[in-house]
Regions:
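NTP-dependent nucleotidyl-transfer catalytic core
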Residues: 1-24, 41-48
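Active-site-adjacent bridging/hinge elements
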Residues: 2-12, 86-99, 151-152
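Glycine- and acidic
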Residues: 12-22, 99-107, 161
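Alpha-helical support elements that line or immediately flank enzyme active sites
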Residues: 33-38
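Catalytic adenosine-cofactor/nucleotide-binding cores of aminoacyl-tRNA synthetases and other
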Residues: 53-147
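Core structural elements
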Residues: 174-180
């Protein structure tokens, strides 16, 4: 592994940003003033500026001064970082305000991740282990059912890719979930 870049090398490797993500309450600064500052400095502009919504807890915007919020460490300690990321991309339409609740997180974790994707992965792995000594076999001739499944997969991949390119993570995950 190479050491991470720093200084000018890091800047050259990471700027300009394809997408500059900002909170909706500071969009004006990042859509007007920040680009003007970049142009004055002779630097390229980000490809797109996208304002995300607020995370609400108990119907209120998270606030340090009001001590309202969630502790990400607690959620990650309980569910793991991948489930944490999944929840916020799936449960809250990117760009809109959204609410977090432990109950909804737990329900989605169980139904969508454990019972859906997790069960599919576990069963497929177990079958390959049981019937093929843990090695995926070389595909044989495809039956009509195989071709139909491949078409459904292709559609799901195209739908997910199209949604992700529009920053619609909820729809992208929904396309994958629909295939599963």
């Amino acid at each position: 592994d190479e050491p991470p870049a720093s200084g000018a090398a890091k800047f050259a490797a990471t700027w300009p940003a394809d997408i500059h993500l900002v909170g909706k309450d500071i969009l004006r600064f990042h859509a007007v003033i920040w680009p003007a500052m970049l142009m004055a400095a002779g630097l390229p502009l980000p490809g797109q500026v996208f304002a995300h919504g607020w995370l609400l807890v108990g119907g209120e915007k998270m606030s340090k001064s009001k001590l309202t919020g969630i502790a990400p460490e607690q959620v990650i300690d309980h569910f793991g970082v991948d489930a944490f990321r999944y929840y916020f991309l799936r449960a809250i339409q990117f760009g809109n305000d959204g609410s977090f609740s432990w109950e909804d997180m737990s329900a989605r974790y169980t139904s969508e991740l454990a019972n859906g994707l997790g069960n599919l992965g576990s069963r497929a792995t177990a079958m390959v282990g049981k019937y093929f000594e843990g090695v995926l076999p070389t595909p044989g001739p495809f039956a009509n059912a195989d071709l139909a499944l491949a078409d459904l997969l292709l559609t799901a991949v195209q739908d997910a890719d199209g949604a992700y390119s529009k920053l619609d993570f909820t729809a992208g995950i929904g396309a994958v979930k629909g295939f599963v």
